Amino acid sequence: MNAAAKPGWMLGPARGPLAPDVSKRIDVLRIVLIGLIVLAHGARGVTVRIDGTGAGTALMLEILNGHVDFVAVPLFFTISGFLFLRKFELSLAAYGGMLRKKFVSLLIPYVLFNAWLVLWFYFVGSIEVMGSWNFIVSEGLFTKTLGLGTAPINYPLWFLRDLLVVFLLSPVLLLFFKEAPGVGLITLFVLWAGVNPLPYTYYGDFFAFYLGGYLARTRLPLEGVSWWQRAGSLLFVILTAVLVWHQPLGITDESVRNVLFKCNLLLGLVFFWRMSAFRIVRDNFLLHRMARHSFFVYLAHEPTVSIFQTRLLAVWRPVDDLQQIAFYWISGLAVIVFLWIVAELISRVAPALYAVMTGSRRPSKSGNG
């Protein structure tokens, strides 16, 4: 299909540079979302390791871990699709080059941070709520290290595995952009919302990734704050409250609740984009500085969270709501700051090692790199 015969529905690549406002908001969201993921995984220190979770703590976890934090993964897929699909055009050379880059940037860190956990289990010992050498041997060392049909040893890294699969099959998404972009968007959403009740599935991965490319190629104005950002944010707050109290409100059909939950994740994308527009967030020097190492924080946050909480619980057993809520935030934020400092040190002292560990991601010298 040549350019002269290009139909009106075909979504071509967006070749212009990203608007500075959009670039800064994406950058700061990286560390914000990673922070939410660290906090979410650290919640097990309260729900699993502490007897008698308080009512206030349970409500906080239901709102944050049960709804707000769930937005992080689809938003990461949406951002990845936005940045990748906005310019990528399919050719054998381009596809091969992309696969080589993703092998370095995704697969190598994925294998490294799973393999070092295998070594930890073998030489040091088990890690509470994460596993042991006997466990991974019984499950299959190769299978668990690569996460084939199961969660990988370092369970949060399933995201990298799924993202790599999405990149491998990205030519299919480009065909949708060429022939039927709207049909592709609706089809992937229906598959995600209706086929599997789980919030995170390959259907959802592909939908969010495709949505990012769709937004980029339709040139939706993302700068500043538009009416749809305000409306979507308000609806997210309202629907989150409805889902938290769905039983008293009479929403007892689980299939209905699941569909509403996934619709709310979409509203969550808008909510976080709106939040990133606030100057205190978008122009925050510290957040931009930390964003340089957000990938390292993600890669290393487990088993760091589990080990830190084990040590902390040895000297402090939170017994009421105030203490349990404090434990949740202190343990999560402490790990984030600690890993950021570690990343700063490694990137300065051994930049080549840091580049290998993080898939050749060398932090820029600018504050919002």
Model region roles, listed by residue range:
Residues 22-23, 90-98, 172-181, 217-229, ...:
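Membrane-interface helix-boundary motifs at transmembrane edges
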Residues 134-148, 188, 200-218, 222-232:
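Long hydrophobic alpha-helical segments that form multi-pass transmembrane helix bundles
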Residues 4-17, 221-289, 293-296, 303-312, ...:
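Alpha-helical transmembrane segments and terminal signal-anchor/GPI-anchor hydrophobic tails
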Residues 73-85, 164-171, 198-225, 241, ...:
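Specific transmembrane alpha-helix
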